[in-house]
């Protein structure tokens, strides 16, 4: 497992926006991770983190509190994929659509008048 100390939360959101890899997210926030799992589910984890952060209001929080909230959200997103696979979680639309119930096609309606 890789881990690093939490970076000083000057503006954690700005730092995360310029992060170039999933590993940087984990290092900036000080979240331990398994490199094997991250190699398989990196995009899924970051997408799920984004979904969770969409419900958060970090703009008016002090830097250390915003960093703590981001860390908690990343840990939660990572835990989702420790417990199950990206196929089970279906974060992306293409995976959701693959199992979406198909709407049955209705037979074409032909009025009796057209059968003359």
Curated annotation (Swiss-Prot):
UniProt KW keywords: Nitrogen fixation
Cited Pfam families: NifW (PF03206)
Stored InterPro entries: NifW
GO BP annotations, alphabetical order: nitrogen fixation
Residues of the signal peptide: none
HAMAP family: NifW
Family the UniProt entry places it in: Belongs to the NifW family.
Assembly: Homotrimer; associates with NifD.
Reported function: May protect the nitrogenase Fe-Mo protein from oxidative damage.
Protein name from the UniProt record: Nitrogenase-stabilizing/protective protein NifW
Chain's gene name: nifW
């Amino acid at each position: 497992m890789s881990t690093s100390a939490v970076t000083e939360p000057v503006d954690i959101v700005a730092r995360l926006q310029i992060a170039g890899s999933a590993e940087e997210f984990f290092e900036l926030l000080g979240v331990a991770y398994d490199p094997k799992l991250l190699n398989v589910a990196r995009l899924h984890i970051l997408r799920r983190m984004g979904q969770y952060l969409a419900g958060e209001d970090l703009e008016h929080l002090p830097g250390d509190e915003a960093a703590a909230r981001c860390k908690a959200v990343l840990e939660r997103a990572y835990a989702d994929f420790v417990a199950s696979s990206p196929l089970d979680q279906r974060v992306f639309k293409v995976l959701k659509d693959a199992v979406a119930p198909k709407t049955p096609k209705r037979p074409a309606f032909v009025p009796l008048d057209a059968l003359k």
